[in-house]
Each structure stands twice: as C-alpha cells, then as structure tokens.
Regions:
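Acidic donor-binding loop at a coil-to-helix junction in glycosyltransferase catalytic cores
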Residues: 171-173, 194-207
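Conserved donor NDP-sugar-binding/catalytic core segment of glycosyltransferases
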Residues: 91-141
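Non-catalytic, C-terminal membrane-associated alpha-helical segments of glycosyltransferases
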Residues: 240-248, 259-330
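Active-site donor/metal-binding and catalytic loop motifs
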Residues: 189-201, 216-238, 249-252
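A conserved acidic beta->alpha catalytic loop
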Residues: 22, 35-45, 85-86
Length: 330
C-alpha cells in the first residue's frame, strides 16, 4: 500500500527542513513528500531537493494547502503532518499503513503525539478554578458536554486523546491520514473560505469528523511524534483568537449535526445558548477582576456573536471573489 506525505508550512524554515530529513530516514519512506509552502519567501533548500515536491502558495490557509497538496499526490494513502514535528519512532509509517490493512472500512488513521502548546500562556488564569464544582456547574449550564476521550460532541467539544488503540471520532491536526479518494469530499470550499478570511479554527476536527461519513477512524495510541511548544501561527491577539475560535464552533456544530444525524436546529440553538453564557461569564469576570486580557476576550465573544448572525459560513458570502475550483486546477 503506497502513501504520500503532505506538509502545509508557513514561516518555519528550520522546522520543516529538519522534519523532512527525519521523514526520509524512516523505513518505509513515502513515495512522495509534498510540501505546500505559504511562507513569505521560498525555501530554496526544499525547492532544490529532488526528494521533495515543493509547491509555493500565496495563500496562508491550512485547509487550502492540504487540498492543494492532494492534487499532486499519487498514492492511495495521504498522510498530513504539521511542519514543526519531531519523529520519535521511525516505524511510524509501517504502523499507519498496517492499520489500514486491518479493516477495509478504515478510511483514516492517526498515531500518538506528545503534544505541547503555547496558546494557553497568552490567557490569564480563570477567576474560578476549572476543576472546581462551580466551574463544572457553569460548564454544564452553558451546554458544554462531558466528552469521553477520543469522542466529539456538540459545539466541536472533544474529550482529549484516547490512550489505547481504537476507533475515534476525530483526529488532532499534527497527524492525520486518509484514503486519497475521500480527501476532496472532506475539505469543502466553505472551509477554505472560512480560513481565507482568518475566521477559521478547528479545521482538523471539521475534516476528520467529515471522514466518518465514509468509514472508520482509527487511532494508534503509541507515541510516534513530538509537537514542541512553538509559537502558534493561529495566535495574533486575544481578540482575534477568541473571535475565530468561537465563530468556528458554529461551523463545527453544523458538521457535527450532519455527520452524527443530529437536529441542525437544536445544534444551532445550543451554539447560541453557549455563546450567550460565555458572554455573561466573561462580563462578570471583567467586572470582578478587570484586565485588558479579559476585556479583549469579551470583545472577541461579542464579535463572534455578531459574525454568526450577519455572516453566513459559505464560500459565496465569505469569499465571493475567489473561485476555488479554478484556483486549484491552475
């Protein structure tokens, strides 16, 4: 079973150079390593590397880069990676490919990742401890479900990584693999437009749970990758991060309703109840303990609410000037 690796990257030259070298040392190695680079300048090392299919893109848009990379792929299995990973077990590819062979209904496979993120350090601690009884009551009041590991629920809420091998509802973005014949069906143009407007978050969840319409997703719990605590390309400010992450939960709610046969009306209703409660909680927090960070968080929530009412999440409304079909075929 042949496989290609696709890596969207943006302004992480040292990381992507190191990671591609690590991939080439694995056995088996991919048929092709496809790097879709939206950096400010071209990566001459990768451009001149005969082992790399190097595509320079003008769009800093991760789902677009994923879909563009698939157009250059030839193998049956496509493995998507983030650009800032380290491989800690060189048998990663044999594990992924052998998992597909276990069951013909498996359409997606991932592996364990030692994941660290720097985003949380940009926010202040909550006034109420997240583990307190009051916090749990507030979560339940706002409609945040208690989700089991490996599962996803309304609002795109996930239950954390599954620590045993097994079927899951979603993948984490640093490592996702799918059968090639479904990729164009699970990365819709609406998602590209959402990210083009810098209003998208959680594209890994949207893509992977959409794949469940076509078969099973399987996660290998063994750690094969390490994701260091690098600066996120998604974090520009508290305001923009909260706005895009909250607005995107409406998109994830629609995908969740479609894939899991839930009432779209009820899922949208749950979204607006959630955002109303979050605005209320953020307002109280700001009054009790004022800070510029809490102020920006509240502004982001209000902006997301406004967008959810006024801006439909489809390509015609988000990016009427872009024809994705023509762009991807050129």
């Amino acid at each position: 079973m042949k496989f290609d690796v696709i890596i969207p990257t943006c302004n992480r030259r040292e990381s992507i150079n190191s990671f591609t070298e690590q991939i080439l040392k694995c056995n088996p190695a991919p048929e092709n390593i496809i790097v879709v680079d939206s950096s400010d300048t071209k990566n001459q090392k990768l451009l001149n590397d005969e082992n790399i299919i190097y595509i320079f893109s003008k769009r800093k848009n991760q789902p677009y880069q994923r879909l563009l990379g698939s157009k250059y792929a030839e193998s049956e299995i496509l493995i998507y990676f983030d650009d800032d990973l380290n491989i800690v077990n060189n048998s990663i590819f044999s594990t992924i490919i052998n998992t597909y062979k276990l069951d013909s209904n498996i359409v997606g496979v991932s592996v364990g990742i030692n994941y660290k993120s720097s985003i949380g350090s940009n926010f202040e601690d909550s006034i109420v401890s997240p583990n307190s009884t009051l916090a749990r009551m507030l979560f339940r009041l706002s409609g945040v479900p208690n989700v089991k590991p490996g599962r996803i629920n309304r609002l795109g809420m996930v239950g954390g990584l599954l620590n045993v091998n097994g079927e899951v509802d979603y993948f984490n973005g640093p490592c996702m693999s799918f059968k090639k014949d479904i990729v164009h069906k699970i990365i819709p143009f609406d998602l590209l437009s959402l990210y083009e407007r810098k209003l998208g978050k959680g594209e890994d969840k949207a893509i992977s749970i959409s794949a469940r319409k076509f078969g099973k997703l399987f996660n290998n719990a063994e750690i094969f990758l390490e994701h260091p605590e690098n600066e996120s390309n998604y974090f520009n400010s508290i305001f923009s991060f909260v706005r895009r992450s909250t607005y995107s939960r409406l998109y994830l709610s629609k995908i969740y309703a479609e894939v899991f046969n839930k009432s779209l009306f009820l899922e949208i209703l749950a979204y607006y109840w959630f955002i109303f409660c979050r605005i209320l909680i953020a307002s109280f927090s700001l009054v009790i303990n004022y800070s510029s960070i809490r102020k920006e968080k509240l502004k982001g929530l209000l902006a997301a609410l406004k967008l959810s009412v006024l801006l439909k999440q489809n390509k015609k409304k988000l990016t009427p000037e872009i024809n994705w079909e023509i762009e991807l075929s050129s």
